[in-house]
């Protein structure tokens, strides 16, 4: 079975990528689906002054979960199971290594994000 990664930022283009994947799966191309949301690091002295590292990590996770909500809803409505991951880092430098790490055959993404 193919593995597909959808880097998802909540943009209209990212939603179109989810819709495209759904159409592929419904056309009988079974896939193991992985959603990925990458959060930019919070590296602000003002924030680090009032939040602990654990609080920043929890904030990143919460905001990542919120960002994935629309993709989750569409995949669940289509009956497609998936794995969701939230990572912190530079978006461009995080997607490809993550795809390699989990052994993805396809990366399905819009032409530009938010």
Spans of features found by a protein language model:
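Glycine-rich, Arg-bearing micro-motifs that act as flexible, cationic patches
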Residues: 109-114
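Small/aliphatic-rich secondary-structure junction motif
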Residues: 1-51
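Short, hinge-like loop/turn segments at secondary-structure boundaries
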Residues: 51-54, 101-103
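A short acidic, glycine-rich active-site loop
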Residues: 53-66
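Structural beta-alpha unit
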Residues: 73-107
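Small-residue (primarily alanine) positions within well-ordered alpha-helices
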Residues: 14-17, 71, 99
